[in-house]
């Protein structure tokens, strides 16, 4: 297990410092599996761990890299104590539906944090040449340079879902000469700026720092989502969302997309006191968390409790009832 110091991620956007907990700390150490360290989940997890660790001493939280698709199974089987994921993956993991091969019924929701949007960055020059949708990417007769993001993440899963729906695969696209990279958001941001890639995808909240940086170094725009792809994503648990105009250079108007709701999961074996204290401490330090990511500025107990039909952890139920977020 690789644990990352929360403060490193908060300060630098991505974390490289690695600490291995000693045996004496193992009982007290709890891990949060995030997404890529510089992405939305990474920053949310790092901020949460940081304020929690500073305001109590019974449990210490650390963050570890993961992915929205992989984290439910990882948490369920003890690979991490908590994990960020998305509502569609949490539901399908509990039920044992694709992309999961078996059910993970011990998963419990702690809190919903945000609604993410599927960001499809593309070089403006490539967009103007006629590659404006996923359909254009799949049917292209010339090799393309595409960043598909780390395998196991919700972003990579979304891309694979679309490609298969269009009758292709990453392997078929690679066979025509495509350059494909499966790297994190920070690396993809740098690569699209320098022209090493022309397409970069990311399920994230707004604003997203990697996307902002990418647009500062190259003229970028967003691919269009066809009605065909919107129907596909709707059938797989995604909901309509809007990427606000004015956040990313060169994109003054709102962009219609599809997205997922990001949430924190644990299992039914997790201490109710730990879950309760995480939520209570987080809300008590919401101004501090708001400086880590703007998502926290809009994060309320009512929003956190809105996990749909997913089962809430008893510690979360206790907190949400106490503050009047649920009955």
PLM regions: where:
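Extracytoplasmic
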Residues: 27, 56-58, 67-70, 77, ...
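A structural signal for short loop-to-beta-strand junctions that line the ligand-binding cleft
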Residues: 101-119, 247-256
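An extracytoplasmic/periplasmic, membrane-proximal ligand-sensing/linker region
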Residues: 194, 199, 204-207, 211-217, ...
């Amino acid at each position: 297990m690789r644990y990352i110091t929360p403060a490193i991620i908060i300060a630098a956007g991505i974390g490289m410092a690695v600490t291995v907990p000693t045996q004496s700390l193992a009982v007290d150490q709890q891990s949060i599996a995030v997404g890529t360290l510089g992405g939305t989940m990474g920053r949310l997890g790092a901020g949460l761990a940081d304020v929690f660790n500073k305001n109590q001493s019974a449990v210490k939280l650390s963050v570890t890299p993961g992915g929205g698709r992989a984290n439910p199974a990882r948490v369920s089987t003890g690979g991490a104590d908590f994990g960020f994921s998305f509502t569609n993956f949490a539901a399908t993991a509990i039920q044992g539906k694709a992309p999961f091969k078996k059910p993970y019924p011990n998963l419990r929701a702690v809190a919903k944090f945000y609604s993410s949007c599927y960001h499809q960055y593309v070089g403006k020059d490539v967009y103007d040449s006629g590659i404006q949708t996923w359909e254009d990417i799949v049917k292209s007769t010339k090799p393309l340079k595409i960043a598909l993001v780390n395998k196991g993440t919700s972003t990579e899963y979304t891309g694979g879902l679309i490609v298969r729906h269009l009758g292709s695969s990453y392997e078929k696209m690679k066979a025509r000469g495509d350059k494909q990279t499966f790297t994190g958001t920070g690396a993809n941001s740098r690569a699209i700026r320098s022209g090493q890639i022309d397409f970069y995808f990311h399920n994230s909240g707004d604003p997203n720092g990697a996307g902002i940086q990418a647009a500062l170094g190259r003229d970028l725009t967003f691919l269009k989502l066809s009605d065909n792809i919107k129907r596909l994503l709707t059938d797989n648990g995604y909901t309509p969302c809007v990427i606000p105009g004015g956040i990313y250079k060169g994109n003054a108007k709102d962009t219609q997309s599809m997205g997922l709701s990001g949430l924190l999961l644990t299992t039914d074996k997790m201490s109710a006191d730990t879950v309760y204290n995480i939520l209570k401490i987080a809300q008590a330090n919401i101004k501090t968390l708001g400086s880590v990511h703007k998502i926290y500025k809009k994060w309320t107990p009512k929003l956190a409790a809105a996990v749909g039909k997913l089962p809430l952890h008893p510690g979360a139920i206790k907190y949400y009832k106490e503050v009047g977020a649920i009955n």
